[in-house]
């Protein structure tokens, strides 16, 4: 069964591929395999809308099942920022380090700040060319560190520490992060749908 990961981001592709391979013998592709196809710009005000926009668009144009996702980081002390703006927090086209710097600067300006709690929320969608849609969510709670640590991962990973851990996401190995992250939790909830689809595919093929 062919399935496309609607991303060109190496880390996301590896994480999702590893997950899919545990469920069945899927024919797995990513947007890197379709250089002429471009996802629409993320312009919605929710991760659900962004994930659906990407998933539906890719499924329609590529003619196969697609997995798409969108993630945001929320910091309660900053009234939920960066929120849906997470990917463009420091401006469209800014680097990950710019987004992290803006967040740390905002937090340092709150002199009486005690609560550094934060959480990632991820929406993952599985979409068919016929507009069949499965949707799941995953949340990972933790806090924002005072400075960047680690060189792995991407985005806000160098400043996010999961509760019960002493290392930032950027200091964890990919294997560990892929077991506890927000995306991992959302993908795990998608597993029954994927397994059912794979079994139906085998029956149809036989």
Curated annotation (Swiss-Prot):
What does the record give as the active site?
70
Q: Where along this sequence does the record place binding of substrate?
A: 7-12, 71, 154-157, 177, 182-183
**Among the record's GO biological process terms, what is one?**
purine nucleoside triphosphate catabolic process
Q: State the InterPro entries in the record.
A: dITP/XTP_pyrophosphatase, ITPase-like_fam, RdgB/HAM1
**Which Gene Ontology CC terms are recorded?**
cytosol
Query: Which residues of the sequence carry a binding annotation for Mg(2+)?
Result: 70
Give the Gene Ontology MF terms in alphabetical order: dITP diphosphatase activity; ITP diphosphatase activity; metal ion binding; nucleotide binding; ribonucleoside triphosphate phosphatase activity; XTP diphosphatase activity
| CDD domains according to UniProt | HAM1
Q: Indicate whether Magnesium appears among the record's keywords.
A: yes
Q: Which cofactor does it need?
A: Mg(2+)
Q: Tell me the PANTHER family matching this sequence.
A: INOSINE TRIPHOSPHATE PYROPHOSPHATASE, INOSINE TRIPHOSPHATE PYROPHOSPHATASE/HAM1 PROTEIN
Entries under HAMAP family matching the protein: Non_canon_purine_NTPase
Query: What exactly does this protein do?
Result: Pyrophosphatase that catalyzes the hydrolysis of nucleoside triphosphates to their monophosphate derivatives, with a high preference for the non-canonical purine nucleotides XTP (xanthosine triphosphate), dITP (deoxyinosine triphosphate) and ITP. Seems to function as a house-cleaning enzyme that removes non-canonical purine nucleotides from the nucleotide pool, thus preventing their incorporation into DNA/RNA and avoiding chromosomal lesions.
Q: Which family does it belong to?
A: Belongs to the HAM1 NTPase family.
Query: What protein name does the entry list?
Result: dITP/XTP pyrophosphatase
From which organism does this entry originate?
Chlamydia pneumoniae
């Amino acid at each position: 069964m062919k399935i496309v990961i609607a991303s060109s981001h190496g880390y996301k592709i590896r994480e999702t591929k590893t997950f899919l391979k545990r469920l069945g013998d899927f024919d797995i592709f990513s947007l890197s395999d379709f250089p002429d196809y471009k996802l629409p710009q993320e312009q919605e005000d929710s991760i659900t809308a962004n994930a659906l926009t990407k998933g539906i668009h890719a499924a329609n144009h590529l003619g196969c099942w697609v997995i798409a996702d969108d993630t945001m980081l929320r910091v309660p002390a900053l009234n939920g920022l960066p929120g849906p703006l997470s990917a463009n927090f420091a401006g469209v086209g800014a680097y990950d380090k710019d987004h992290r710097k803006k967040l740390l600067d905002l937090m340092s300006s709150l002199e009486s700040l005690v609560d550094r709690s934060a959480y990632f929320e991820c929406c993952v969608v599985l979409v068919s060319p016929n507009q069949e849609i499965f949707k799941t969510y995953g949340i990972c709670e933790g806090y924002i560190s005072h400075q960047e640590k680690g060189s792995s991962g991407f985005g806000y990973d160098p400043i996010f520490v999961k509760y019960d851990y002493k290392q930032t996401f950027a200091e964890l190995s990919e294997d560990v992060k892929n077991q506890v992250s927000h995306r991992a939790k959302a993908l795990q909830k998608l597993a029954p749908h994927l397994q059912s689809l794979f079994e139906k595919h085998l029956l149809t093929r036989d």
